[in-house]
Regions:
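Start-transfer (signal-anchor) and selected internal transmembrane alpha helices
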Residues: 1-38
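Intrinsically disordered, low-complexity domain-flanking/linker segments in eukaryotic proteins
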Residues: 28-38, 89-96, 171-185
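Short hydrophobic/aromatic helix or loop-helix immediately within or flanking a transmembrane segment
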Residues: 48-93
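Transmembrane alpha-helices of multi-pass, membrane-embedded glycan-processing enzymes
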Residues: 77, 81-88, 103-117, 156-159
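Specific aromatic-rich, kink-prone transmembrane helix
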Residues: 117-120, 137-140, 155-190
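Short acidic/glycine- and proline-prone juxtamembrane loop motifs at membrane-interface regions
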Residues: 143, 148-155
Length: 193
């Protein structure tokens, strides 16, 4: 199911890029002092999904928590953006562009992994047919643009669904004595990440 999830992310991104070029939108978030969205670079294609909270995640990835209003944004996602953005920047891509690309890749890979974990979780709870249906509905849900953008939604979906997967998998293995192995991992994933 991860392939379907990744394919749909690409389609959503293409749709957003087309709309971003043809539709004038109201976006007051670009008034931030440093938006880190280059205007004349290959990142123009990615600009269609760098809106609203994405700017704050990029700001935290670049400069850390400089302003009080930025403290509302959980640090895991910006830390991953910074880590992978610096690796991508080694290829010669501008830092801003590499951070945007890193954020997109993190979101897309997290969503693909969340789709796979949704399928596995649903197989434990339901039949395989219902597992496929629920996963396809998860993949094509109307909030798909948030799963494709530089938001924590995909990463947190992956972590939450993975935690639930281990919880229910542990319940099915409990009689076999294997819960001792999965309980600490399940609790860590579901409760502390």
């Amino acid at each position: 199911m991860w392939k379907e999830g990744l394919l749909f992310r690409v389609l959503i991104f293409a749709f957003a890029a087309l709309l971003g070029e043809g539709v004038i939108d109201y976006d007051s978030s670009l008034d931030l002092p440093s938006s880190h969205v280059p205007v004349t670079t290959p990142c123009n294609l990615l600009r269609s999904i760098v809106k609203w909270d994405s700017l704050y995640f990029l700001e935290v990835a670049h400069n850390g928590y400089m302003y009080e209003k930025i403290h509302a944004f959980f640090p895991l996602y910006p830390m991953l953006i910074r880590f992978f953005g610096e690796i991508i920047a080694l290829s010669g891509l501008e830092t801003e562009c590499s951070y945007i690309l890193a954020g997109v890749l993190i979101s897309w890979i997290s969503f693909a992994a969340a789709s796979e974990m949704m399928f596995r979780l649903s197989k434990i709870l339901f039949s395989e047919t219902r597992a496929e249906l629920s996963t396809y509905l998860f993949i094509i849900n109307p909030a798909g643009i948030f799963m494709s953008a530089l938001y924590t939604t995909s990463l947190f979906s992956f972590l939450s669904i993975t935690g639930l997967y281990f919880f229910y998998k542990d319940m099915s293995l409990e009689n076999k004595g294997k819960s001792v192995i999965t309980v600490p991992l399940r609790n860590w994933i579901a409760g502390t990440v």
